[in-house]
């Protein structure tokens, strides 16, 4: 039964409430399902917390409604266009932008700022390396800065995207050098960075070789032709057929 509880917790990413409240008769049959993203779930996201903590009180500021700010160096796209590109409502986009411009008046987030955000939310470990990888995943055009558009499009996929969209985004995160495939070295670097960020005071205590074991299991399932790399097709096909992998993918939502 302990294994079942852990599986439920992994599958919902702590977004569906306390698994202990699920009737015993139903726990064994629980399958992975798309999380229901409630307000509480959104508030568990580090980047959402960072932005909303800086958001000014709601008001009639017309600059928010049109996503305009004369002092910024980078002007974001219009509200209607961003709403069409994402799955956020106008009010959600306004709140996100309000916090974004308060924290980043230039309209851009650089990598040092991004690392600082994660160091604040994960003080028990070293979030520097993971923040670096995540920054590169959000920085869609690779120019060394995250625009508001990059920010909300990425969050929209992670929080409200389809399974296919989330998996493609995760593949891009793992594919560090962006050559279209994932190597064991790339996967190991990502896994080590996550373990480093979570710190040594996790429960249960993780062995030092845990990241390597995770990678080896990953490649045994993913690398269908045994050529030492995982392609996007192998990644998508295997993930969507393997419940355990899909469960583990949901854990990303706790460290975004």
From Swiss-Prot:
The keyword Membrane applies. It comes from the Eukaryota. Ca(2+) 1 binds at residues 175, 177, 179, 181, 186. Signal peptide: none annotated. One of its GO terms (biological process) is behavioral response to pain. One of its GO terms (cellular component) is cytosol. Pfam families: EF-hand_7 (PF13499), EF-hand_8 (PF13833). Residues 243-256 are annotated as: Interaction with KCND2. Changing residue 14 to S: In strain: 129/Ola, BALB/c and FVB/NJ. Keywords: Apoptosis, Calcium, Cell membrane, Cytoplasm, Endoplasmic reticulum, Golgi apparatus, Ion channel, Ion transport, Isopeptide bond, Lipoprotein, Membrane, Metal-binding, Nucleus, Palmitate, Phosphoprotein, Potassium, Potassium channel, Potassium transport, Repeat, Repressor, Transcription, Transcription regulation, Transport, Ubl conjugation, Voltage-gated channel. Ca(2+) 2 binds at residues 223, 225, 227, 234. Residues 67-123, 126-161, 162-197, 210-245 form the EF-hand domain. InterPro entries: EF-hand-dom_pair (IPR011992), EF_Hand_1_Ca_BS (IPR018247), EF_hand_dom (IPR002048), Recoverin (IPR028846). Palmitoylated. Palmitoylation enhances association with the plasma membrane. The keyword Lipoprotein applies. Changing residue 186 to Q: Abolishes calcium-binding. There is a cross-link at residues 26, 90 (Glycyl lysine isopeptide (Lys-Gly) (interchain with G-Cter in SUMO1)). It is found in: Cytoplasm; Cell membrane; Endoplasmic reticulum; Golgi apparatus. Residues 1-22 are annotated as: Disordered. GO terms for molecular function: calcium ion binding; calcium-dependent protein binding; core promoter sequence-specific DNA binding; DNA binding; magnesium ion binding; potassium channel activity; potassium channel regulator activity; protein homodimerization activity. Its main location: cytoplasm. Binds to DNA as a homomultimer. Dimerization is induced by binding to calcium. Interacts with the C-terminus of PSEN1 and PSEN2 and with PSEN2 CTF subunit. Associates with KCN1. Component of heteromultimeric potassium channels. Identified in potassium channel complexes containing KCND1, KCND2, KCND3, KCNIP1, KCNIP2, KCNIP3, KCNIP4, DPP6 and DPP10. Interacts with KCND2 and KCND3. PANTHER family: CALCIUM BINDING PROTEINS, CALSENILIN. Calcium-dependent transcriptional repressor that binds to the DRE element of genes including PDYN and FOS. Affinity for DNA is reduced upon binding to calcium and enhanced by binding to magnesium. Seems to be involved in nociception. Regulatory subunit of Kv4/D (Shal)-type voltage-gated rapidly inactivating A-type potassium channels, such as KCND2/Kv4.2 and KCND3/Kv4.3. Modulates channel expression at the cell membrane, gating characteristics, inactivation kinetics and rate of recovery from inactivation in a calcium-dependent and isoform-specific manner. This is Calsenilin.
